[in-house]
């Protein structure tokens, strides 16, 4: 429950009649004219118990100040009292009798007779019309917080606020969005994934030539043995030919030599042959390749035709050991 307190006009009359506040007196009680001490604290200095006691009493009456809880603020008390006096419709200031300068500055007010209900309505309607006309005449930049608060306080509002509704534009907004938004296909989400399988067929570049894969067989042990036997026979034949070559002893300047002349042996028995040395070639067997031919069974006439263009090597004497 809000605390009920006395309105400002009867409270002010009671304070004037009590004669407890210095400077607050009736000038003309019949015309309800009174004065209030209005000393400027910044210029003349204040005595709270003498110059600001009326403002402090009003702050205590309205509950804005409690002794011991808040620090005293005389300037704020005076400003709140002035605003309350200006808001009263049945009290007006007599400006031609007020003194605003000096240490004895006072303000003079007149209490008007109480207004009837019809007068109150007319006064409120007039104030609301004045506020509307001022709002139309003034541009937006000339508005002040005081003017806006005065217009709100002077305007009358009905007690029933149920008919105050905000117009809804949701339907129109939705229609505009539907017209502006292009039609989109519905998006469906499925939890199953398709099987990603691609058939792969390997086809050769040319289908005309198709061959079966074949592996060459390894040589048998018998074939390898025959190759080794042939190589052994060839070496034996060469050694026999070298052994059958006749070495003849001879002496040159008292020194003994062995002489081997080709063709000294009868051709009918051994046949003639030629031996040509080849340069050394690294081979897996590590032997010197010799080109030779067995001419035992060769015709002598054919042999002569083959050996005619061959230049015989020069014969060198081999010294014998003494």
Swiss-Prot record:
GO terms for biological process: apoptotic process; defense response to virus; immune system process; negative regulation of DNA-templated transcription; negative regulation of regulatory T cell differentiation; positive regulation of DNA-templated transcription; positive regulation of interferon-beta production; positive regulation of transcription by RNA polymerase II. SUPFAM superfamilies: Winged helix' DNA-binding domain (SSF46785). Phosphorylated by CK2 and this positively regulates its activity. Sumoylation represses the transcriptional activity and displays enhanced resistance to protein degradation. Sumoylated by UBE2I/UBC9 and SUMO1. Inactivates the tumor suppressor activity. Elevated levels in tumor cells. Major site is Lys-276. Sumoylation is enhanced by PIAS3. Desumoylated by SENP1 in tumor cells and appears to compete with ubiquitination on C-terminal sites. Residues 92-164 are annotated as: Disordered. Residues 5-113 bind DNA. Gene3D superfamilies: Winged helix-like DNA-binding domain superfamily/Winged helix DNA-binding domain (1.10.10.10). Coiled coil: none annotated. Keywords: Acetylation, Activator, Antiviral defense, Cytoplasm, DNA-binding, Immunity, Innate immunity, Isopeptide bond, Nucleus, Phosphoprotein, Repressor, Transcription, Transcription regulation, Tumor suppressor, Ubl conjugation. It comes from the Eukaryota. One of its GO terms (molecular function) is DNA-binding transcription factor activity, RNA polymerase II-specific. PROSITE patterns: IRF_1, IRF_2. One of its GO terms (cellular component) is cytoplasm. Its main location: nucleus. The modification N6-acetyllysine is found at residue 78. There is a cross-link at residues 276, 296 (Glycyl lysine isopeptide (Lys-Gly) (interchain with G-Cter in SUMO)). The keyword DNA-binding applies. Activated by MYD88. It is found in: Nucleus; Cytoplasm. Residues 146-157 have a biased composition (Polar residues). Transcriptional regulator which displays a remarkable functional diversity in the regulation of cellular responses. Regulates transcription of IFN and IFN-inducible genes, host response to viral and bacterial infections, regulation of many genes expressed during hematopoiesis, inflammation, immune responses and cell proliferation and differentiation, regulation of the cell cycle and induction of growth arrest and programmed cell death following DNA damage. Belongs to the IRF family. PANTHER family: INTERFERON REGULATORY FACTOR (PTHR11949), INTERFERON REGULATORY FACTOR 1 (PTHR11949:SF3). Monomer. Homodimer. Interacts with EP300. Interacts with MYD88. Interacts with PIAS3. Interacts with SPOP. This is Interferon regulatory factor 1. It comes from Bos taurus (Bovine). The gene is IRF1.
